[in-house]
Amino acid sequence: MLDLTYDTPKPRVIAGAKQDWELVIGMEVHAQVSTRAKLFSGASTRFGAEPNSNVAFVDAGMPGMLPVINEACVSQAVRTGLGLKAQINLESAFDRKNYFYPDLPQGYQISQLYHPIVGEGEVLVELGDGLARLVRIERIHLEQDAGKSIHDMDPALSFVDLNRTGVALMEIVSKPDIRSPEEAAAYVVKLRQIMLYLGTCDGNMQNGNLRADVNVSICAPGQYEKYQATQDFSHLGTRCEIKNMNSMRFIQQAIEVEAKRQIAIIEGGGTVDQETRLYDPDKGETRSMRSKEEAHDYRYFPDPDLLPLTFDQAYVDAIAADLPELPDAKKARFIRGFGLSDYDASVLTADIDAAQYFEATATKDTGKLSANWVINELFGRLKKDERQIEDSPVAPAQLASLIALIASDTISGKIAKDVFEISYTTGRDPSEIVETEGLKQVTDTGAIEAAVDQIIADNPAQVAKAQENPKLAGWFVGQVMKATGGKANPKAVNQIVAQKLGG
């Protein structure tokens, strides 16, 4: 694997009225596990079903109903942990987190406080311009999702949909390593990318399948370094948690306004209360939801209905053997094998479907050309039509055929764009289009020379100007291309024009 090295970015510094402040951010990302059934029942996880139609007795908290672990959820959590280079714990356990809410019919959530299934890991978050932040993962644990309370269907009533109750979540908890709003958003993007490659979460933030709680605090310059040396969190300031963020843009906005709120409080002589807050994008502010609870407030205790979850190393090894190539490794291979730039490789590996499409079109010799066509022409056309790459009217084999025609000088780049448009709108194969429409590039130097001679003969005044200023030779090249319908080989045209005018 190619060794990609990056510099660590400086932390975001926010100027207060009295002094500068630095941001400290930790995140808890809740990712819905991609499985057909829930964590402890066989009820479907399908999104968009009729309210309260995907609910088993155990999900509804019916008396006497016992949870049964879904092995597929366990496998997906292990798979995610391996993808984040994390420690897999061969023994973990489930605990009850006790609290009351209408959409939590059991009166508790089954989670993993004391013995999570996955321990410490890491994720490299690339930030562009040769910068990257290594964010440490503290833990990943499995837990049940809650239901959904609906308050806008009736002015006097609230409704509860339990379809989501009991759906498996992976809570991915980071260390307080993130130092700017941009890094926070990029971190969630990278987690989402890795899980999409792994197939462990579909990453759909609109449906609530990926949500983030953001812990924000501020500290004076130099205090973070003291935390690093001592692991004493008091150096980092009092943190506030912003709940249920489901947009990269909102994550960044919420961090900005929350940091400024905390700075104003401290510089005004007050103290920041540790609490859970909600971001209101319409008002551009965070507002208090409740005081931030500690673990003892939830009276955690081991779930008596569930035995400890144990498996052996062979189970982990079997999952590891089935892991796909992940984004960082694929990016490095694209740079090494196809000669791509860091930027182009990043764009192509950002989405697994795009990466697979590119690989189906490229060879070692046409890698850069293929990347240019996929990124600029195909992506641009798909964006215009609001289509995803998996819905592309141009199949990878068709684009590969077009690229081969360009690489072999059968057609020019200009003609290739016309061929691409025809293929995109009709589905026809590029080779067939070129043959049928007579679009092959003119490479006969005799024919090109004749066209050049004719244009020179017809434009003596332009010849005189071009001989005084060689930069004007481009006018003759353009006229030859126009006369040949864009079919003349541009390289040959340039050479012949230069020879004729120079002579």
UniProtKB/Swiss-Prot annotation:
EC category name: ligase
Residue intervals passing through the bilayer: none
Keyword set, alphabetical order: ATP-binding, Ligase, Nucleotide-binding, Protein biosynthesis
One Pfam family, short name: GatB_N
PROSITE patterns: GATB
Coiled coil (residue ranges): none
Catalytic activity: L-glutamyl-tRNA(Gln) + L-glutamine + ATP + H2O = L-glutaminyl-tRNA(Gln) + L-glutamate + ADP + phosphate + H(+); L-aspartyl-tRNA(Asn) + L-glutamine + ATP + H2O = L-asparaginyl-tRNA(Asn) + L-glutamate + ADP + phosphate + 2 H(+)
GO biological process: glutaminyl-tRNAGln biosynthesis via transamidation; translation
Gene3D superfamilies: 1.10.10.410, GatB domain, N-terminal subdomain
Functional note: Allows the formation of correctly charged Asn-tRNA(Asn) or Gln-tRNA(Gln) through the transamidation of misacylated Asp-tRNA(Asn) or Glu-tRNA(Gln) in organisms which lack either or both of asparaginyl-tRNA or glutaminyl-tRNA synthetases. The reaction takes place in the presence of glutamine and ATP through an activated phospho-Asp-tRNA(Asn) or phospho-Glu-tRNA(Gln).
Assembly information from the UniProt record: Heterotrimer of A, B and C subunits.
NCBIfam families: gatB (TIGR00133), PRK05477.1-2 (NF004012), PRK05477.1-4 (NF004014), PRK05477.1-5 (NF004015)
PANTHER family: GLUTAMYL-TRNA GLN AMIDOTRANSFERASE SUBUNIT B MITOCHONDRIAL AND PROKARYOTIC PET112-RELATED (PTHR11659), GLUTAMYL-TRNA(GLN) AMIDOTRANSFERASE SUBUNIT B, MITOCHONDRIAL (PTHR11659:SF0)
Family: Belongs to the GatB/GatE family. GatB subfamily.
Protein name, UniProt field: Aspartyl/glutamyl-tRNA(Asn/Gln) amidotransferase subunit B
Organism: Jannaschia sp. (strain CCS1)
Gene name of the record: gatB
